[in-house]
Amino acid sequence: MLLVDTNVLVDVLQDDRQWANWSIRQRRAQACIHPLTINPIIDAEVSLSFSTFEGLDRAVSTLGLALREIPRPALFLAAKAFVQCRRRGGSRRQVLTGFFIGAHAAVEGWPLLTRDASRFSTCFPTLEVMAP
């Protein structure tokens, strides 16, 4: 499994000028190696790009994404990492949702495909981050 971060999916779905090509190539390449996965946090964040649930559901299916629940140990790790990163001077703009994503991948032992390598690498040092 490989967890695909929200920013990669938004790049693909909204045809982002700067990042769409990289995100499309990476998603396709990784789909040949790993089953692609999202969690409810990513699903909710991506849903902002759609006016209906059916549109979101079609896109998730078309992109070959499986939805996996976040295990409780990952929720625990997310909270601990959030507090630890804030204490080390992390940005006050960082929100807990990103920590749920990083902790989910870390606890499951899955790589994470993202454009936000620095935050995930800093807060989850054992996490395999695939980023530009």
Write out the residue ranges for each language-model feature.
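Conserved glycosyltransferase catalytic-site signature
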Residues: 6, 40, 97-99, 117
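A general structural signal for well-ordered alpha-helical segments in protein cores
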Residues: 20, 43, 53-56, 75-79, ...
